[in-house]
Amino acid sequence: MELLDAATMNCLDGYQGQVFDHKPMLFFEYHGTGNEVEQVLDTLPGALEDFGSCNFQSATTQEDINALWKARHDAFWAVKAQYPGLDVIATDVCVPVSNLAGIVEETAGDIVELG
């Protein structure tokens, strides 16, 4: 699972012709048998909607998968383009899924506080 926060999505909107809402975006990658992947694709949209998700996209062909992941792969460069001359630091965090919303809110607050 990968998360791009709202600030990053703002930078990605319009970068390389891509169009995005300025909202956090989660990326999930699943591997398994056709049946296992189908079960995830049947379950995940409803679970995400229960927590306020407003858009779910999935892909099963390599071309469509690459198109969905393009935003994740372009994130660093989109931020660099939005803020030329500034150093960009990409970080990872590992938290239980149950704490994900809290860490996103806390980090967003840190970004606002630190400018």
Task: Enumerate the language-model features and the residues they cover.
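C-terminal substrate-recognition/cap domain of FAD-linked oxidoreductases
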Residues: 1-115
